[in-house]
């Protein structure tokens, strides 16, 4: 099987089947269930004694191709598609941590993730402990015998910090703690492959660069197959002790290195039900086929826009890991490839005579967003079209003011998911908006 990313995104996971029509494209298997060969075959499938399909809440042939393809792109051994990125996070964390346990993470997170960890997981009895930053020694200070995961983002949203994966993984593994990385901004493995640097589990909002066109919501969990669950039977009994739901089946024995993804699929996905539809899976497969082509343009456009903004007299600061001025630029050069990602943030200088008490929606930054014509003001990233948003008032709105600042979210921050349009048109859109807002006035 070819091993290059550009080829895998087109071919991985699709094997010739017994379909009499021999379709070249991956078919949409719009079926709820699958006919057993006989009664014994049905019993074997339900007992996890033989591989195969039972019901599309657990497995579906369309999704099977998607899962295998994403696992290949990320360097994992198995994957599980879910109904959204939030669902992927939920299953990944609850597959490791139970009531009374804790996970350790950073304040440098997407607002929806931070809120899910702080509020929703608390209701499940799972404590989330947040470090202000991403230094390995700071994470280690929060570990105890009940810590079941260290959770990071490969490119933090919205600070775009790139963690020092190798050092962080070494600290976590020293304590028998698996590392879970949300690689959404790593674009399906195109910009970043955390498993290569020791991460154990990778999640994605497949809605973003994997789908790439803003047409469907989905998520995925990828299992590296490398964490030694058998070495920690008391810490992770769900893999080493008999399963109550499968008459004593032991996941470590039944699934080997894929024990984690096997457990999440056959117990959590089965019982909680956040399944991806085959129609959505098909759309994500369509997106995957051009991922490297789009990713290259996203990355080059983002760097050029960041450089333009950094030189603009209307801009007070720019945050993009591809700029030497970014605090994590050296880590970005070490851990990112094919570019530095497709998202950046910047702040706009104040209009003359602006005051702290002014209506925030009349501030220069809000006006710049409102006067953009090509870029769309909406809550998404990874679309082929350029998108903008003010996270302080939207994606991170549920956080307290202190939590927003800890996450790197300020009132003047404008996040840009840079699309694949011609870069001169993107820059011209921002230039025209600046000219309209400032109208010949010098920024303060």
Swiss-Prot record:
Q: Please report the name of this protein according to its UniProt entry.
A: Homocysteine/cysteine synthase
NCBIfam families noted in UniProt: OAH_OAS_sulfhy
Q: What PROSITE patterns does this protein's entry cite?
A: CYS_MET_METAB_PP
The protein's UniProt keywords, in alphabetical order, are: Amino-acid biosynthesis, Cysteine biosynthesis, Cytoplasm, Methionine biosynthesis, Pyridoxal phosphate, Transferase
Cofactors required: pyridoxal 5'-phosphate
What PANTHER family does the record point to? HOMOCYSTEINE/CYSTEINE SYNTHASE, HOMOCYSTEINE_CYSTEINE SYNTHASE
**Involved pathway(s):** Amino-acid biosynthesis; L-methionine biosynthesis via de novo pathway; L-homocysteine from O-acetyl-L-homoserine; Amino-acid biosynthesis; L-cysteine biosynthesis; L-cysteine from L-serine: step 2/2
The protein's annotated catalytic reaction(s) are: O-acetyl-L-homoserine + methanethiol = L-methionine + acetate + H(+); O-acetyl-L-homoserine + hydrogen sulfide = L-homocysteine + acetate; O-acetyl-L-serine + hydrogen sulfide = L-cysteine + acetate
Q: What is its EC number?
A: 2.5.1.47, 2.5.1.49
One term under GO cellular component: cytoplasm
Q: Which Pfam families match?
A: Cys_Met_Meta_PP
- GO MF entry, a single one: cysteine synthase activity
Give the modified residues of type N6-(pyridoxal phosphate)lysine.
208
Q: Does the keyword Cytoplasm apply?
A: yes
The gene for this chain is MET17
Report the leader peptide range: none
Protein family per UniProt:
Belongs to the trans-sulfuration enzymes family.
Which InterPro entries would you find in this protein's record? Answer: Cys/Met-Metab_PyrdxlP-dep_enz (IPR000277), Cys_met_metab_PP (IPR054542), OAc-hSer/O-AcSer_sulfhydrylase (IPR006235), PyrdxlP-dep_Trfase (IPR015424), PyrdxlP-dep_Trfase_major (IPR015421), PyrdxlP-dep_Trfase_small (IPR015422)
Name one process (GO BP) from the record. Answer: L-homocysteine biosynthetic process
Localization recorded for this chain is: Cytoplasm
Assembly mode: Homotetramer.
Entry-linked SUPFAM superfamilies: PLP-dependent transferases
This molecule's function is given as: Catalyzes the conversion of O-acetyl-L-homoserine (OAH) into homocysteine in the methionine biosynthesis pathway. Also catalyzes the conversion of O-acetylserine (OAS) into cysteine, the last step in the cysteine biosynthesis pathway.
């Amino acid at each position: 099987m070819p091993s290059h990313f550009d080829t895998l995104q087109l071919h991985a996971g699709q094997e010739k089947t017994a379909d009499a029509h021999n379709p070249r494209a991956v078919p949409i298997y719009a079926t709820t269930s699958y006919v057993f060969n006989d009664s014994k075959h049905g019993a074997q499938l339900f007992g996890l004694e033989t591989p195969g399909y039972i019901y599309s809440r657990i497995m579906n042939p369309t999704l099977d191709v998607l899962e295998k393809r994403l696992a290949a792109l990320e360097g994992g051994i198995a994957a599980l598609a879910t109904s959204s990125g939030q669902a992927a996070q939920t299953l990944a964390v609850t597959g490791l941590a139970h009531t009374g346990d804790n996970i350790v993470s950073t304040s440098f997170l997407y607002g929806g993730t931070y809120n899910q960890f702080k509020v929703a997981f608390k209701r499940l009895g799972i404590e989330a402990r947040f470090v202000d930053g991403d230094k390995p020694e700071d994470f280690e200070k929060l570990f105890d015998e009940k810590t079941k995961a260290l959770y990071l983002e490969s490119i933090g949203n919205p600070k775009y910090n790139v963690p020092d994966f190798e050092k962080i993984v070494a600290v976590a593994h020293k304590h028998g703690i698996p590392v879970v990385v949300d690689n959404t901004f790593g674009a399906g493995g195109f910009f970043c492959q955390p498993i290569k640097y020791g991460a154990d589990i990778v999640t994605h909002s497949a809605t973003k660069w994997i789908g790439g066109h803003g047409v469907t919501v989905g998520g995925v969990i990828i299992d590296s197959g490398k964490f030694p669950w058998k070495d920690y039977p008391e810490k992770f009994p769900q893999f080493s002790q008999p399963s109550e739901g499968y008459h004593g089946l032991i996941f470590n024995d039944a699934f080997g290195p894929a024990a984690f993804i096997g457990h999440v699929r056959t117990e959590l996905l089965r019982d909680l039900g956040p399944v991806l539809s085959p129609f959505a899976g098909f759309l994500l497969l369509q997106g995957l086929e051009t991922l490297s082509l789009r990713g290259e343009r996203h990355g080059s456009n983002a760097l050029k826009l960041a450089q333009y903004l950094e030189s603009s007299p209307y801009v007070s600061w720019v945050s993009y890991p591809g700029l030497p001025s970014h605090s994590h630029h050296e880590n970005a050069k070490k851990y990112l490839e094919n570019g530095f990602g497709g998202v950046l943030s910047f702040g706009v200088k104040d209009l003359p005579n602006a005051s702290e008490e002014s209506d925030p929606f009349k501030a220069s930054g809000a006006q710049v967003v409102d006067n953009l014509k090509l870029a769309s003001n909406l809550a998404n990233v990874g679309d082929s079209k350029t998108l903008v948003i003010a996270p302080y008032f939207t994606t991170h709105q549920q956080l307290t003011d202190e939590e927003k600042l800890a996450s790197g979210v300020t009132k003047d921050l404008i996040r840009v998911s840079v699309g694949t349009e011609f870069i001169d048109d993107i820059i011209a859109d921002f230039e025209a908006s600046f000219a309209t807002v400032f109208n010949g006035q010098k920024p303060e």
